[in-house]
């Protein structure tokens, strides 16, 4: 449970883990839900507006879904809210039809962390309603200590509020005892801004290694399955050169 950091030793006591693309392999589901949502507002496939909207969606992954739609419909709050509602219904419907599947090794990683007394907080840009649906589908009540969405903390990513809320709620004494893991640039920004010692980008989701490093990743992992090896000891994973502190 110790990680060399800045010449000293930090004990990791909390892992804040992103949901979509990190702990659950639902990237295609999420993309389809975004596409359906903007189509209901008149932005349809095959148009330049659709292409621009989906580029915005990709760049904004990890941020609160309502904020993604506000970026697409900046002058029409009602339209953004309507699109967000369609997104939630589409995504939740997909969960009901197909279920959710974590990437290989994810469940085992959670179990190893919990066995080592590392607390687990799941974080997301989804609404509380959608988060509750995801948690029900996963049946992970015995594997996580807390699950937060933006409305639980104040602001969503790339702000650090969810990480800091988890620190307070779970009684962590020092933000340096936190590891933040995600698949998007906004996850990395949030982790760095929170002061977490470990901000690890995983390659199972939406953004490339380069984007994750741009966001300030301290480590790059193939998947969440590698996290116990990083924070619990054993083989050391080197920090990537060039990770920016933001």
Where is each model-derived feature located?
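Short acidic capping loops at alpha-helix termini that bridge into adjacent secondary structure
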Residues: 46-49, 142-146, 174-179, 198
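Structural recognition of alpha->loop->beta junctions
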Residues: 139-149, 211-229
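Substrate-recognition/cap helix-loop segment adjacent to the acidic, metal-dependent catalytic center
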Residues: 39-41, 69-74, 99, 107-121, ...
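Acidic, Mg2+-coordinating phosphoryl-transfer loop and its flanking beta/alpha structural elements
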Residues: 179-219
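Non-catalytic pre-domain segments flanking phosphatase-related domains
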Residues: 1-17, 239-246
